[in-house]
């Protein structure tokens, strides 16, 4: 009986260890810190910016410049707040040729009109909104579980990556991301 109890406790302990390992893993989406930020060109439909209603490679357009790149499923209040603040940062850092854009991985009808209205209503100056397929560009590894993926990069290397599941993105996250723009515009 003693032997059985010891074996049972060991099994429970090892099961708990395995479970904690999986539960503690964070969601990965998009290029990770230290990786190449632009694994391959892709051509989303730009809604605003220099080439509205045209497909253009935004990572190509920005080259090695500092960039805030977002992949999102749909607009929400905190995402719009982030977009507005990153637009202001992009304007402020125009001498460093900072670029910023959000690619919506979504094919729902009416999204282009909704995003055009967003760009107009928020008076976006330098921030480009674009649409791509629901899975996102394949080499960028956008997780199907990620609602919002933010990648800050410069010289084509990722400096910061933030990934959020649906409902997890909060106002405090907006402030953290905006403060980390300083890492790419040094």
Predicted feature residues:
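Thiol/disulfide oxidoreductase modules built on the thioredoxin-like
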Residues: 62, 134-174
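Bacterial N-terminal signal peptides
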Residues: 8-16
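Short active-site neighborhood of thiol/selenol oxidoreductases, capturing the structured segment around
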Residues: 56-81, 98-101
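Thiol-based oxidoreductase modules, predominantly thioredoxin-like and allied folds used
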Residues: 96-111, 124-136
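A short beta-strand-turn-helix
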Residues: 43-67, 88
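Typically the conserved alpha-helix immediately C-terminal to a functionally engaged Cys/Sec
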Residues: 76-91, 112-114, 118
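N-proximal helix/coil linker or "cap" segments that precede and/or mark the start of modular domains
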Residues: 19-44
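Short, internal strand/loop/helix patches
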Residues: 43, 118-143
């Amino acid at each position: 009986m003693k032997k059985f109890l010891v074996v049972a406790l060991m099994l429970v302990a090892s099961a708990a260890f395995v479970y904690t390992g999986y539960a503690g893993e964070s969601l990965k989406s998009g290029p990770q810190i230290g990786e190449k930020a632009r694994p391959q060109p892709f051509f989303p439909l730009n809604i605003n910016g220099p080439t509205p209603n045209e497909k253009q490679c935004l990572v190509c357009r920005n080259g090695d410049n500092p960039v805030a790149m977002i992949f999102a499923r749909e607009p929400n209040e905190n995402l719009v707040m982030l977009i507005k603040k990153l637009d202001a940062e992009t304007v402020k850092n125009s001498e460093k040729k900072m670029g910023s854009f959000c690619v919506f991985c979504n094919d729902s009808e009416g999204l282009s009109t909704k995003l055009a209205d967003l760009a107009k209503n928020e008076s976006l100056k330098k921030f480009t909104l674009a649409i791509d397929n629901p899975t996102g560009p394949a080499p960028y590894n956008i997780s199907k579980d990620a609602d919002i993926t933010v990648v800050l990069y410069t010289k084509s290397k990722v400096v910061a990556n933030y990934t959020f599941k649906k409902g997890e993105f909060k106002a405090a996250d907006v402030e953290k991301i905006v403060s980390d723009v300083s890492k790419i515009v040094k």
